[in-house]
Amino acid sequence: MSPDTVGAVTDRVGPVRSASSRRQADWAPVNTAPSVPAVEPAVAEPVGELIVDWYDGAARDLPWRAPGTDPWAVLVSEVMLQQTPVARVEPVWRAWLARWPTPAALAAASPAEVIRAWGKLGYPRRALRLREAAIAITERHAGVVPADVDELESLPGIGTYTARAVACFGHGQRQPVVDTNVRRVVARLVHGRGEAAAARAADLADIAALAPQDDARAVRFSVAVMELGALVCVAGTPRCGTCPVADRCAWRLSGYPAADGPARRVQKFAGTDRQVRGRLLDVLRAAAEPVEPAALAQAWDDAVQRSRCLDSLLVDGLVVQTDDDRFSLPE
């Protein structure tokens, strides 16, 4: 139940892929950051409770957060929310589950069907990886999404963040779930930094220490702190006046010190290979039969860039070339 990171969004103590309304893709913790003080539980728990109380009154009405949402629906939402805003995900998520309500149903679909249904969510390799995960769930787990984090992480395309998110939000387990939004909240609230450093193993310990002692409240806290980062503790201009823990925020209390290092560059889209790949896939999605190279040439004028992007789509398994040198989605 990943909210978007307010603009890309991603993965389990035991990585929600962007633009502030996007989720960071799954990440692997790195241990190069300097050590930071542990969160004191006596101080941390009231903070966690305050965040849950705030969430109970401020949460967005997102369908994958509804009580009783099954783990498969949660898994689909988490994969879609990586790198894609909530507003674009919701209609596709609903249509996807109406068409493929179980892992077995998706496992039986063709790659072409899956790519077409993915539409314009972006990063379409996620669609193929989700299908591969559905096949693995069907073959290894009798069609039931596993609850164990390690088993989840062994599925194709499922990283640490997604595995913990499914275990927590889909199976109701007490699991620290850390995405870009959560790391930013912890960086400011606990460590007094305006921006989060690179993902690190200590992030999981930080968020676990902040969680309420009650297991059910801890599960709710995991989504509540994401929502706080998505709606209030945002990357650009945080809305500290509406923050439920502003009076305990180390960054605010220290006078909002500026982040170290160069400002982050805004990622452009126009003219990138991502845009070209999308244009080529649009042509193939709309075609009932394999298309001639000339049809793809109409989608993008730059022949060198077009050829490079077409090659990358072939390598990624998103496009196939026929014996007569036409192109189509994989069947």
Where in the sequence are the language-model features?
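Short amphipathic alpha-helical interaction segments
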Residues: 300-314
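A short, conserved structural fragment
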Residues: 314-327
